[in-house]
C-alpha cells in the first residue's frame, strides 16, 4: 500500500515535470493559488461560524446578487456536510448521488460530523471585498481563462471546512478544504482548494445500517438539473482531489459557472500554457498511480503500468474487494422474451457469499408467465457465480480478471429450435459498493409451466482464453422437468470481453483453458412473491475429479482430517481430540484428557495416564492385569497365563519409558491403512490351547474385547487374539457396517441464549440443562438443510416465533425458537409452561413478569404503586412522605398534592399554574388556542413532530431520499403523496427495515395435513383439503358418506326427518321449543335454537350424539344459519335484538356483529360464496329484510315496509345468489336479487308460510294454516304437498334440506382462526385489505369492542 511519503514523492516528481514558461512559473507562484483564503481581523464584513454538529446550516444574505448557471441568487447557505446551496436550506446529509434537488456547489459533499471536535475544528463563511483578496482572485481568473483578460472581481465569498471529522462523531482522521466564489456583475468563477494532506477520509460510518455512505462528491448542480462532477467524485479516487488539478497546481481547481447557456455546462481553464505533461510519464506509475485502488500497488512495465491488489484483497487492481466479504449485485432487465416485453420494473438483486462461492439471486416483480420462462435464461444464473467463483489452485475468478467491468454476450440454442440472445454489461461498483449490471434479453425459449420444477444437474464448463481480455465458452446442457417427463437440451455460447493488463512477468494466457464447476443449482419461480429465485455454488480452477480435500482449498487445523462432503468439505477431529475455540475464536482440535474427565475405562485399581489422542491404564502396586482389569497379586498367582503373544506387553505395575501396552499398534495401523480392503476381524484367531483355562482369566482380555465362555474375543472393528486388540480403522474413522467410515465431528455443549428476563433457550438439537447454564447436544442437527438455505442473518428465513442468533461454538448464525416455543428455528411450536414468561396473561394488568434468579423462573410482580401477589394487584398508597411526591408537592394522607400556586400538568408533574393552560411547552413547540374547546394547548412547529410537552424533533427524511429500506422491502408513497415509508414486499412482514419471510405452506409444507395441498389463492397460499376430505387444511378428515335428499323440519317440541317423497317421516330429537335450524353438511349435523331452554344444540342427522353448542348469554335464538366454508354459525336473538356469530369448531369464540336498530329479528340466511349475511325483522311498524358483510359491516336495507309485512324465514339460492323469503303478511314466497334489487314472486295467495328451503329446482315451505310442507317448482307450478305426521305441536317452524352436494372452498378464516388472536374471531370481509376482519369476542377483556352495526 503506498505510504504518505511515497505519495508526497510522487507529487514532487509530478510537479517537477510540469513545463511552464519562466513568465508563468513566476506568475503562479505570485498567485499563491494553493493557499487558503483567510479572514483577517479588521477586514470589512464579518465571518460566520457554523455551530458544532452533524447537520447545521447558516445563511449569508449577499450584498450583491451572484450568478450561477443561468440564475441569479441573493442568499447562500453553508452546510456542515461540505456543500453550499442557493436560496434553500439543506441541513440533512442525503446519501444519494448527484444531482441533488437544490442548486448547489459541493467542495467535498460527505457526511461531516463536528459534534465532539476540539477548538481546531471550524466551518466558516465570509464575504470579502478586501482589495488584496480581490486582486489575487482576479489575477487567477485572468491567468486561467484566455477570454477573461479584463476580468475584475467585485466580491469573493469563501467557505472553509477546517479539520472536520466524519459521522458518527469520529475525529481520528480530519479533512480540510475550501471553496471560493469569485464574481463580478455578470460572471462567476468557483475555486476549490484541497491542501496537501488535507483529505484523509471519504465517507461516514453507518455501523452496518442500510446502505453505506457514498464517498465524497465534488461538483455543481444547477436548478434545472444539469450537473458537473470532478474526476473521482463519489469514488475512491476522490482522495486524489488534493493531488490532481485542472489549473497546474496540485489540489487547486477553477471553473467558470456563470454565465452558462441552457445547453452548456461549467467550463474548465483553457490557458494552453498552464500545464504540459511529459510524454515519458504519460503512462507510468509516477503519473497514474492514483488510478489504482487504494488497496492496490502500481507496477510499471515496458509500456504502461498495471495495478495489482494487495494481500487480503482481490480484483483487477483498479477495483479491489476484501477477501471473504459478502457483496451485493443489482441490475435492471430490458428486452423481449417469447414476443412479450420484459418488464422494466423487474430488478435483479444478488447476494454473494464470497467465502463459499455461493450466490443467491432474486428478480422481481415478474408475472408467472415471464418468471417461469426466465428460469431458462441460464446466463442470469451463471454470470455472477463466474465473477465470484471460489478459486482453486490460485486460478483467477471473474472479478480478479475484470474488476467487475466487462461485457458478457450469450447465445442459447434449444434443441426444440428456439434461440435467445442475452447481453450483460457490468459497470463496476456503484456509489454504494454494489456491483451494477444492465441485462438485455431478446429471443424465445420453450414454454414451461410456472409450477414445474426445473432440475439442472451439477456441471463443469470450460472457458478458453481467445486472447488477453477475451474468454469464450461453449457448453451443452440438459434441464430436467420431472412433472412433464421431458428434458430440455440446449447449447450455451458465451463470450466475455474486458480490459486486460498483463505485467511483464505474466504469461500470455491465449489458448489456455479454465474449468469452472457449477453446483447446487436452484431455479424457482415463487408466484406469491412474483419473484424468480435462483442460486448456485461455483469453483474455478477445478478438475473433473477434484474435491476440496485434494485441490488445496480445504483448510483443516492440526489433529483433524479433511472429509469431502457434498460439494464442500468438513474437518473432523481425530479420535481422542475434540473441537474447541481458541482465544482468537478459531476452532481447533485439542486432546481430550480422558483421565480428567472420567471418560476412561481403567480398572478402579489402576492409574490412568493421558496421552496425545488417547490414554493408558496401569495396575497399581499389588495388582496385576492389563490396566482395564486388575486383580490382586495373590489371585493372579493362582492363575495359569497362556504363552505371551508376540507384540503383547507384559502386565506391569509401573509405567515404563514407553508406556504403550501395544508397541506395535502404530505399525499395525500403518499396514492396515495401506491395504485396499479392510480386514475382517476374526473372533477366534488363535489356537485352542490359548483359550483361558479358568473363568477368572477373563480379566486378561483387552479393553476392546469381550469374554465368551472363557474365550477373549475382540470387538467388531478390532483385530487380535482377545488379549491384545488393535483398531482396524485409523484416526478420525470408526468401524461401521463392515468398513471404516469417517467419524463425524463430535457435538459439544454450547452456551444458551438468554434474554433480559433470564429466560434461556438452546438451538435445535440441544437441550437446556437443569441449571440453565449449558445446552447439551441430544440429537442430530440437520446441517444439510442449513447449508442449502440462505443464512438467516442474510435472508431472515427463521420462523415467526424464532430469532437469528450467532453461536460461536457452531461458528454460524442459527435460527432459535423464542421462549415458549420448541423446534428447529424454521418451525417453532408452542410449549406449555406455567411460567409468566410463557403465559404473560396470568399476571394482573398492573403486574410485570420478572425473572427471579433464586427461583430459576419468572414470576408475576405488582408494579410500583400496587400491592398484591402478582396475580391480583391493588392500588397502594401513593405516598408516605413528601419525598415520594417530587418537587412542588407534599403528601396528604397518602395522596400527593401540589403546593399553593402549583397545579398538575398532563405528565402528572406539579408546575407553576398558568402558562399554556397548565403546562409548559417543550422545545420546538408553541402554545395555541382551541376556540372550539376553549382551551390552550401545545403544538409542534411546522416541520417538527413528537410530544409538544417534552419537546419536538425535526421530521426525519423519508426513505425515498435516504434509501434506507431493508432487504425484501421497497420505499412506497403513503396516503399523503408527499410522504414515503418502507414497506415489506409480498411474502414478507415487518416494519420495512427488518422484513421476515411469512410462514406459508410453500416454504413450510408441514403446515398442511397429509391429505391437503398447498394452493395459491387470492388470499395467498393456503392449505386445501383434498377431494373427499374436509377441514381447514392443517387438519383434514375424511368425508363420511351422509344420507341425503330429505328435509329436517322443526315441529316446536320435536325435530323430524322428512324424506322428499313424504314417506317414512320420523322424529330424530326432542326439544322444548325449536324455531330456526340449519345443517352442517361437512360433519353431518343439524343445529337448532331452543327459545325455551335458551340454548343452541346439535345432533347428527339420525338424531344421535346430542351436543350443546351455545348455552350462556343467549335468550331467544329464532334464526340459525351456518357458513360451512368458514365454519361459522350465525343466529338472530329476538329477545336481545342482536345478530351474533360463533365458530363451529370453538363456540367460545363468539361475537355480536349487529346490535343496533333491531326490533324483532327472526329469519337469517348466509351466502358463503358471495360472503353476505341476510336477516328479517318482524318489526310491526317497519318490517324489513337487511343485509351486511359476514362481519356485520356494510349494513344495508334490502326490503322495507313497502315490500314486506311479516317476513319469516330466508334462504339463499346457491347458483343465482337470490334471497328468497316467506312472508306471512303478504302471503307470498318471493325472491330478490341483492345487486339490482329485482323481485320475482314464486307463489302467492298462500295461507301462513313460515320456514323455507330450496332444492332440486323446487321451493319447500312450512304453512301454519294448511299444516303441510308446501311445494312449488322454480317456474311457480304447485306440486303435491307433504303431510307429515305431527309428533309435537301442530305448527311447523324452521326447516332445511340435506343434499348430496356439500361445498368445498377456501376461506381466509379456515386456518388458525385466520391468524387472529385468542381474543378475536376471524370473519370474512373481502373489502378489508387482508380479506378478513378480527372481531373482538364477547368474552374478551383486553380487546376494544367497537360498536357493531350502526
Curated annotation (Swiss-Prot):
Give the span(s) annotated as Disordered. Answer: 645-691
Q: Which UniProt keywords apply?
A: Basement membrane, Calcium, Cell adhesion, Disulfide bond, EGF-like domain, Extracellular matrix, Glycoprotein, Repeat, Secreted, Signal
Q: Which compartment or compartments is the protein found in?
A: Secreted; Secreted, Extracellular space, Extracellular matrix, Basement membrane
- Which N-terminal stretch is annotated as signal sequence? 1-22
Return one Gene Ontology term, BP aspect. Answer: cell-matrix adhesion
Q: Which residues form the Nidogen G2 beta-barrel domain?
A: 325-550
Q: List the disulfide bonds.
A: 285-298, 292-307, 309-320, 549-562, 556-571, 595-608, 602-617, 619-630, 792-804, 798-815, 817-828, 836-849, 843-860, 862-873, 916-927, 921-938, 940-952, 959-971, 965-982, 984-995, 1001-1014, 1008-1023, 1025-1036
Q: Which residue ranges does the record assign to the EGF-like domain?
A: 281-321, 545-583, 591-631, 788-829, 832-874, 912-953, 955-996, 997-1037
Q: Which GO terms describe its molecular function?
A: calcium ion binding; extracellular matrix structural constituent
Residues in LDL-receptor class B repeats: 1084-1126, 1127-1170, 1171-1216, 1257-1282
An example GO CC term for this entry is: basement membrane
Q: In which tissues is it expressed?
A: Expressed in the basement membrane around the follicular epithelium of the adult ovary (at protein level).
Record flagged with keyword Protease:
no
Domain of life per record: Eukaryota
Residue stretches making up the NIDO domain: 107-260
Summary of the function given for this chain in its UniProt record: Cell adhesion glycoprotein which is widely distributed in basement membranes. Involved in cell-extracellular matrix (ECM) interactions probably by connecting the laminin and collagen IV networks. Required for permeability and mechanical stability of basement membranes, and ECM dependent neural plasticity. Not involved in assembly of the embryonic basement membrane.
Domain comment?
The NIDO domain (also known as globular region 1 or G1) contributes to the localization to the basal membrane probably by binding to vkg. The EGF-like 1 and nidogen G2 beta-barrel domain (also known as globular region 2 or G2) contribute to the localization to the basal membrane probably by binding to vkg.
Q: What name appears for this protein in its UniProt entry? A: Nidogen
**Organism of origin:** Drosophila melanogaster (Fruit fly)
Amino acid at each position: 500500500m503506498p505510504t504518505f511519503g511515497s505519495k508526497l514523492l510522487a507529487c514532487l516528481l509530478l510537479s517537477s515535470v510540469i513545463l511552464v514558461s519562466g513568465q508563468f512559473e513566476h506568475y503562479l507562484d505570485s498567485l499563491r493559488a494553493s493557499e487558503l483564503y483567510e479572514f483577517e481581523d479588521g477586514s470589512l464584513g464579518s465571518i460566520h461560524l457554523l455551530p458544532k454538529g452533524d447537520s447545521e446550516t447558516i445563511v449569508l444574505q449577499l450584498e450583491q446578487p451572484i450568478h450561477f448557471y443561468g440564475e441569479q441568487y441573493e442568499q447562500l447557505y453553508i452546510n456542515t456536510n461540505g456543500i453550499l446551496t442557493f436560496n434553500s436550506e439543506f441541513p440533512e446529509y442525503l446519501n444519494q448521488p448527484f444531482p441533488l434537488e437544490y442548486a448547489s456547489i459541493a467542495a467535498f459533499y460527505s457526511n461531516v460530523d463536528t459534534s465532539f471536535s476540539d477548538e481546531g475544528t471550524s466551518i466558516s463563511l465570509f464575504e470579502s471585498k478586501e482589495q488584496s483578496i480581490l486582486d489575487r482572485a482576479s489575477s487567477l481568473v485572468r491567468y486561467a481563462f484566455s477570454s477573461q483578460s479584463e476580468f475584475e472581481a467585485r466580491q469573493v465569498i469563501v467557505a472553509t471546512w477546517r479539520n472536520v471529522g466524519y459521522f458518527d462523531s469520529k475525529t481520528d482522521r480530519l479533512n480540510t478544504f475550501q471553496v471560493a466564489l469569485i464574481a463580478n456583475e455578470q460572471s462567476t468563477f468557483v475555486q476549490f482548494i484541497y491542501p496537501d494532506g488535507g483529505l484523509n477520509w471519504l465517507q461516514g460510518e453507518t455501523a452496518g445500517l442500510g446502505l453505506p455512505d457514498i464517498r465524497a462528491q465534488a461538483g455543481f448542480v444547477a436548478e434545472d438539473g444539469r450537473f458537473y462532477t470532478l474526476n473521482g467524485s463519489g469514488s475512491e479516487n476522490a482522495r486524489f482531489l488534493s493531488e490532481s488539478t485542472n489549473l497546474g497546481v496540485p489540489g487547486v481547481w477553477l471553473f467558470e459557472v456563470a454565465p452558462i447557456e441552457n445547453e452548456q455546462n461549467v467550463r474548465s481553464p483553457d490557458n494552453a500554457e498552464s500545464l504540459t505533461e511529459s510524454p515519458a510519464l504519460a503512462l507510468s506509475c509516477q503519473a497514474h498511480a492514483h488510478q489504482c485502488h487504494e488497496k492496490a500497488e502500481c507496477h510499471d512495465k515496458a509500456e504502461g503500468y498495471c495495478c495489482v491488489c494487495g494481500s487480503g484483497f482481490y480484483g483487477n487492481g483498479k477495483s479491489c474487494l476484501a477477501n471473504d466479504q459478502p457483496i451485493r449485485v443489482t441490475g435492471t432487465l430490458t428486452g423481449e422474451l417469447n414476443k412479450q416485453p420484459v418488464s422494466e420494473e423487474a430488478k435483479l438483486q444478488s447476494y454473494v457469499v464470497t467465502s463459499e462461492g455461493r450466490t443467491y439471486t432474486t428478480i422481481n416483480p415478474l408475472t408467472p408467465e415471464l418468471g417461469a420462462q426466465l428460469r431458462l435464461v441460464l446466463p442470469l444464473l451463471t454470470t455472477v457465480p463466474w465473477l465470484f467463483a471460489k478459486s482453486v489452485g490460485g486460478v483467477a475468478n471473474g472479478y480478479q480478471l475484470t474488476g467487475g467491468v466487462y461485457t458478457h454476450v450469450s447465445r442459447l440454442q434449444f434443441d426444440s429450435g428456439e434461440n435467445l440472445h442475452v447481453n450483460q454489461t457490468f459497470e463496476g461498483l456503484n456509489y454504494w459498493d454494489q456491483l451494477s449490471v444492465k441485462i438485455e434479453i431478446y429471443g424465445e425459449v420453450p414454454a414451461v409451466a410456472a409450477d414445474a420444477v426445473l432440475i439442472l444437474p451439477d456441471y463443469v464448463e470450460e472457458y478458453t482464453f481467445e486472447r488477453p481480455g477475451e474468454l469464450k465458452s461453449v457448453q451443452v446442457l440438459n434441464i430436467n422437468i420431472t412433472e412433464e417427463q421431458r428434458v430440455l437440451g440446449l447449447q450455451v455460447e458465451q463470450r466475455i470481453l474486458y480490459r486486460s493488463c498483463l505485467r511483464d512477468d505474466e504469461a500470455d494466457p491465449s489458448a489456455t483453458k479454465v474449468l469452472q464447476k457449477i453446483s447446487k443449482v436452484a431455479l424457482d419461480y415463487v408466484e406469491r412473491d412474483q419473484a424468480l429465485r435462483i442460486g448456485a455454488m461455483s469453483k474455478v480452477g477445478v478438475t473433473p475429479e477434484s474435491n476440496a480435500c485434494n485441490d488445496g482449498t480445504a483448510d483443516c487445523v492440526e489433529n483433524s482430517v479433511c472429509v469431502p462432503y457434498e460439494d464442500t468439505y468438513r474437518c473432523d477431529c481425530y479420535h481422542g481430540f475434540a473441537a474447541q475455540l481458541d482465544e482468537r475464536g478459531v476452532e481447533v482440535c485439542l486432546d481430550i484428557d480422558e483421565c480428567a474427565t472420567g471418560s476412561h475405562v481403567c480398572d478402579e485399581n489402576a492409574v490412568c495416564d493421558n496421552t496425545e489422542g488417547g490414554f493408558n491404564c496401569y495396575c497399581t502396586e499389588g495388582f496385576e492385569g492389563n490396566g482395564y482389569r486388575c486383580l490382586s497379586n495373590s489371585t493372579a498367582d493362582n492363575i495359569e497365563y497362556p504363552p505371551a503373544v508376540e507384540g503383547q506387553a507384559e502386565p506391569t505395575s509401573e509405567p515404563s519409558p514407553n508406556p504403550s501396552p501395544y508397541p506395535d499398534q502404530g505399525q499395525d495401523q500403518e499396514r492396515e491403512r495401506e491395504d485396499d480392503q479392510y480386514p475382517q476381524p476374526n473372533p477366534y484367531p488363535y489356537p485352542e490351547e490359548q483359550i483361558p483355562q479358568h473363568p477368572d482369566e477373563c480379566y486378561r482380555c483387552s479393553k476392546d474385547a469381550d469374554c465368551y465362555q472363557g474365550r477373549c474375543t475382540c470387538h467388531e472393528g478390532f483385530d487380535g487374539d482377545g488379549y491384545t486388540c488393535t483398531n482396524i480403522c485409523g484416526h478420525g474413522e470408526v468401524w461401521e457396517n463392515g468398513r471404516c467410515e469417517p467419524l463425524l465431528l463430535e457435538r459439544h455443549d454450547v452456551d444458551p441464549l438468554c434474554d433480559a428476563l433470564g429466560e434461556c433457550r438452546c438451538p435445535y438439537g440441544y437441550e437446556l440443562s437443569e441449571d440453565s447454564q449449558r445446552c447439551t447436544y441430544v440429537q442430530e442437527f440437520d446441517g444439510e438443510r442449513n447449508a442449502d438455505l440462505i443464512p438467516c442473518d442474510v435472508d431472515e428465513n427463521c420462523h415467526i416465533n424464532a430469532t437469528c442468533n450467532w453461536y460461536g461454538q457452531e461458528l454460524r448464525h442459527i435460527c432459535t425458537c423464542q421462549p415458549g416455543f420448541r423446534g428447529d428455528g424454521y418451525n417453532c411450536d408452542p410449549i406449555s409452561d406455567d411460567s409468566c414468561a410463557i403465559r404473560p396473561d396470568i399476571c394482573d394488568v398492573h403486574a410485570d413478569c420478572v425473572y427471579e434468579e433464586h427461583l430459576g423462573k419468572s414470576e408475576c410482580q405488582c408494579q410500583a404503586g400496587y400491592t398484591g401477589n402478582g396475580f391480583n394487584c391493588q392500588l397502594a398508597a401513593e405516598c408516605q412522605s413528601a419525598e415520594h411526591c417530587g418537587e412542588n408537592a407534599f403528601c396528604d394522607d397518602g395522596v400527593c398534592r401540589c403546593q399553593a400556586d402549583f397545579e398538575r400538568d398532563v405528565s402528572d408533574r406539579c408546575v407553576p399554574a398558568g402558562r399554556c393552560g397548565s403546562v409548559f411547552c417543550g422545545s420546538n413547540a408553541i402554545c395555541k388556542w382551541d376556540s372550539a374547546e376553549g382551551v390552550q394547548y401545545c403544538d409542534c412547529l411546522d416541520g417538527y413532530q413528537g410530544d409538544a410537552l417534552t419537546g419536538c424533533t425535526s421530521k426525519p427524511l423519508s426513505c425515498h431520499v435516504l434509501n434506507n429500506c431493508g432487504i425484501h422491502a421497497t420505499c412506497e408513497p403513503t396516503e399523503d403523496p408527499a410522504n414515503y415509508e418502507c414497506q415489506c414486499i409480498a411474502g414478507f412482514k415487518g416494519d420495512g427495515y427488518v422484513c421476515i419471510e411469512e410462514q406459508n405452506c410453500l416454504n413450510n409444507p408441514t403446515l398442511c395435513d397429509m391429505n391437503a395441498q398447498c394452493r395459491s389463492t387470492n388470499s395467498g397460499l393456503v392449505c386445501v383439503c383434498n377431494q373427499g376430505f374436509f377441514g381447514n387444511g392443517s387438519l383434514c378428515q375424511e368425508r363420511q358418506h351422509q344420507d341425503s335428499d330429505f328435509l329436517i323440519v322443526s315441529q316446536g317440541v320435536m325435530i323430524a326427518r322428512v324424506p322428499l317423497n313424504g314417506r317414512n317421516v320420523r322424529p330424530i330429537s326432542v326439544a322444548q321449543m325449536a324455531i330456526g335450524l340449519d345443517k352442517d353438511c361437512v360433519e353431518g349435523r343439524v343445529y337448532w335454537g331452543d327459545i325455551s331452554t335458551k340454548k343452541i344444540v346439535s345432533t347428527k342427522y339420525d338424531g344421535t350424539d346430542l351436543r350443546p353448542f351455545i348455552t350462556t348469554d343467549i335468550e331467544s335464538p329464532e334464526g340459525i344459519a351456518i357458513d360451512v366454508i368458514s365454519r361459522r354459525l350465525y343466529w338472530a336473538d329476538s329477545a336481545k335484538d342482536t345478530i351474533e356469530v360463533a365458530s363451529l369448531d370453538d363456540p367460545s369464540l363468539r361475537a355480536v356483529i349487529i346490535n343496533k336498530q333491531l326490533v324483532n329479528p327472526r329469519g337469517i340466511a348466509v351466502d358463503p360464496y358471495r360472503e353476505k349475511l341476510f336477516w328479517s325483522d318482524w318489526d310491526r311498524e317497519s318490517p324489513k329484510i337487511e343485509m351486511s358483510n359476514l362481519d356485520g359491516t356494510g349494513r344495508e336495507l334490502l326490503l322495507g315496509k313497502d315490500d314486506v309485512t311479516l317476513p319469516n324465514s330466508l334462504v339463499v339460492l346457491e347458483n343465482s345468489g337470490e334471497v328468497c323469503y316467506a312472508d306471512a303478511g303478504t302471503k307470498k314466497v318471493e325472491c330478490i336479487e341483492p345487486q339490482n334489487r329485482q323481485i320475482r314472486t314464486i307463489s302467492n295467495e298462500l295461507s301462513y308460510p313460515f320456514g323455507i328451503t330450496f332444492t332440486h329446482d323446487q321451493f319447500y315451505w312450512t304453512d301454519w294454516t294448511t299444516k303441510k310442507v308446501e311445494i312449488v317448482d322454480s317456474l311457480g307450478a304447485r306440486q303435491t304437498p307433504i303431510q307429515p305426521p305431527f309428533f309435537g305441536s301442530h305448527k311447523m317452524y324452521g326447516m332445511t334440506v340435506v343434499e348430496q352436494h356439500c361445498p368445498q372452498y377456501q376461506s381466509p378464516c379456515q386456518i388458525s382462526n385466520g391468524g387472529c388472536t385468542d381474543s378475536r374471531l376471524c370473519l370474512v370481509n373481502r373489502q378489508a385489505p387482508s380479506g378478513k376482519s378480527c372481531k373482538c369476542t364477547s368474552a374478551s377483556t383486553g380487546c376494544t369492542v367497537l360498536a357493531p352495526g350502526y
